[in-house]
Amino acid sequence: MSKQSFYPVILAGGSGTRFWPRSRRRQAKQILALDGKQTMIQKTMERLLPLGTEKDFWVITNEFLAGEIQRQLPAIPPRQVVVEPDARNTAPAIGLAGFLLERTAPDSIIGMFPADHVIADEKKFRKVLQRAIEIAGREDHIVVMGVQPARAETGYGYIETGDKMETELFRVKRFTEKPNQQRAEEFVTAGNYYWNSGIFVWSARTLTRALREHLSETTPYLEQIAAAWGT
């Protein structure tokens, strides 16, 4: 698969409340340099560049962060920094990106990446991501990256895996949002649960088809926005 066919979409619309007081609405953690060097969104883009090209990146953010993100990531075309007029959680942001790319690059593979991840082994991460891209390209699959839980964490969502398809590749049985402590401990003990990383990979067509099926009330509005984008 060529680099040009993979489009990373960085989700950077957080309000900055969970990292308060260091993080604020206009200084959310994704635009902060917590290590004193690169900001989290800069690290996210750098981590993904071996698999994509700068001109193929998209960012979904809000009006308070858009200007600073464009300053920090000047290589991304301004029209590809999408500003949400109102925060409506993740699904509409992902949906808008999907419909925009369906129009501009219908054969593309799309990856959705939170802007605030810390990943220690980036080489291994890219290896797993490359495999996800290949699977999404050859199959009509939505691929989600799971993380082996290190503890019974109540702050993350969990993925319950079902049948094994290939080495380290499983069907998803169900998603569970942030559980209480008891359930989190049960998940870790069971051995077939993973933390939900929030990283998804799919073809543009697979994504938009799923949106039309499962987000039917919102989809027409997203399609209208995508059709008018850049006009």
Which residues fall in each region the model found?
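Conserved N-terminal catalytic core of the sugar/cofactor nucleotidyltransferase
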Residues: M1-I10, T17-R25, A33-P114, V118-R126, ...
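Structural signal for hydrophobic packing residues in well-ordered secondary-structure cores
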Residues: M45, L49-G52, L73, A105, ...
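A short acidic, often aromatic-flanked loop/helix-cap motif at beta-alpha or helix-coil junctions
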Residues: A87-P92, R151-E153, Q181-R183
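A structural signal for short, well-ordered beta-strand segments and their strand-loop junctions
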Residues: M112, V144-G146, N196, V201
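Basic phosphate/pyrophosphate-binding loop/patch that engages nucleotide-derived ligands
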Residues: E122-T167
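Catalytic core of tubulin tyrosine ligase-like
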Residues: Y156-T231
